[in-house]
Amino acid sequence: MSILDEFKSFIAKGNVMDMAVGIIIGAAFTGIVSSLVADLINPIIGLITGGIDFSNLFVNLGDGDYVSLAAARDAGAPVFAYGSFITAVINFLIIAWVVFLLVKIVNRVKDAAIHKSAKEAEAQPAGPTQEQLLAEIRDLLKRSPA
């Protein structure tokens, strides 16, 4: 088997394809969560905290006075941008929460399917045991003329 054939076999496996789909959807989902945090959650938090914009919080580590983080970065000033970190933590927590909920839903669906199949298996009448079948065969053999 050539290396190209092995690679084709590897790619054709369900796990790799599922992972690829997950990565693509995850990348798209990151954009949605970033927008959710930047456009919806941060403004609400800013309203509650008196207009604080977390993404613009920073400490200037160099000389000069800058009105915003963007201005400090444009000037090339060294900054400690802890607001960006807070925003990243909020993004992570939201993504982690959504993934947790999705896993919880998938596990519930799996458990329900397993429970349903177990109930269906219990509902079916049990067939004769191996010993009962062997006893029937023995009895039939005894009754048949030799």
From Swiss-Prot:
<dbReference type="GO" id="GO:0005886">
    <property type="term" value="C:plasma membrane"/>
</dbReference>
<keyword id="KW-1133">Transmembrane helix</keyword>
<keyword id="KW-1003">Cell membrane</keyword>
<keyword id="KW-0472">Membrane</keyword>
<protein>
    <recommendedName>
        <fullName>Large-conductance mechanosensitive channel</fullName>
    </recommendedName>
</protein>
<keyword id="KW-0997">Cell inner membrane</keyword>
<comment type="similarity">
    <text>Belongs to the MscL family.</text>
</comment>
<keyword id="KW-0813">Transport</keyword>
<dbReference type="InterPro" id="IPR037673">
    <property type="entry name" value="MSC/AndL"/>
</dbReference>
<feature type="transmembrane region" description="Helical">
    <location>
        <begin position="44"/>
        <end position="64"/>
    </location>
</feature>
<keyword id="KW-0812">Transmembrane</keyword>
<comment type="subunit">
    <text>Homopentamer.</text>
</comment>
<comment type="function">
    <text>Channel that opens in response to stretch forces in the membrane lipid bilayer. May participate in the regulation of osmotic pressure changes within the cell.</text>
</comment>
<feature type="transmembrane region" description="Helical">
    <location>
        <begin position="21"/>
        <end position="41"/>
    </location>
</feature>
<feature type="transmembrane region" description="Helical">
    <location>
        <begin position="83"/>
        <end position="103"/>
    </location>
</feature>
<dbReference type="InterPro" id="IPR001185">
    <property type="entry name" value="MS_channel"/>
</dbReference>
<keyword id="KW-0406">Ion transport</keyword>
<keyword id="KW-0407">Ion channel</keyword>
<dbReference type="InterPro" id="IPR019823">
    <property type="entry name" value="Mechanosensitive_channel_CS"/>
</dbReference>
<dbReference type="GO" id="GO:0008381">
    <property type="term" value="F:mechanosensitive monoatomic ion channel activity"/>
</dbReference>
<dbReference type="InterPro" id="IPR036019">
    <property type="entry name" value="MscL_channel"/>
</dbReference>
<dbReference type="Pfam" id="PF01741">
    <property type="entry name" value="MscL"/>
</dbReference>
